[in-house]
A protein has these predicted regions:
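Sequence-structural signature of mature extracellular/luminal beta-sheet repeat domains
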Residues: 1-80
Length: 80
């Protein structure tokens, strides 16, 4: 059978940054109880977006925070 698509290319991924310990607080929230079956959680990150300076913004839905991650990998809370 003819396949016009190239074979998938394996790309090796590596960790660029992870949430600093000072922002981790494993606990129950109004969000985590129904969404994570009453398990305590540290965060639930989603909604990545970049600005023109290369900062990455992500939303912590569980704790109602927005983080900014600089191109150097430094984390700040922008909204809480």
């Amino acid at each position: 059978m003819f396949n016009p698509f190239k074979q998938l290319e394996l790309i090796k991924a590596e960790v660029w940054t992870s949430m600093p310990q000072k922002f981790r607080n494993k606990s129950h929230t109004k969000w985590s109880d129904p969404n994570r079956q009453n398990l305590p959680i540290e965060c639930f990150l989603e909604g990545p977006a970049f600005d023109r300076q290369g900062n990455l913004f992500i939303v912590d839905t569980a704790f109602q925070r927005i983080f900014r991650i600089t191109p150097q990998g430094e984390w700040d809370v922008v909204v809480q």
